[in-house]
């Protein structure tokens, strides 16, 4: 922490949580701590969007604001985005409890990709 409120890779609220939002600010996210690593996935969707995903237990992620879910053929996860600005915000499982959800790291305030390990995930269909 540098000034009691920031870390190298995110804004830390008074509660110690890291916050972020979509581009227009209508969807906000709060996670328990700054990410230590992020996943760079090569699935058909992530390869097109360039998302970096950080994972947290479902119960530790707070999402406020209305989102729209995109669900494709395998129907395993819902990819959520803001209906106003279109920013992808997070994904949640639909069929089974993975015990985690994915949050798009670049939405976290002051996220610095150079401050975290980026792990390549091979999920190409």
Predicted ranges, named:
Residues 2-21, 26-125:
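A short Gly-Trp-Pro
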């Amino acid at each position: 922490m540098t000034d009691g409120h920031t870390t190298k890779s995110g804004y830390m609220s008074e509660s110690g949580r890291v916050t972020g939002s979509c581009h227009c600010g209508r969807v906000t996210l709060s996670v328990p701590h700054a990410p230590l690593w992020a996943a760079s996935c090569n699935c058909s969707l992530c390869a097109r969007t360039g998302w970096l995903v950080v994972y947290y237990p479902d119960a530790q992620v707070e999402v406020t604001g209305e989102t729209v879910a995109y669900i494709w053929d395998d129907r395993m996860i819902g990819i959520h985005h803001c209906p106003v600005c279109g920013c992808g915000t997070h994904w949640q499982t639909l069929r089974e409890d993975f015990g985690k959800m994915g949050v798009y790291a670049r939405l976290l305030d002051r996220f610095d990709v150079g401050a975290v390990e980026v792990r390549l995930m091979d999920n190409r269909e």
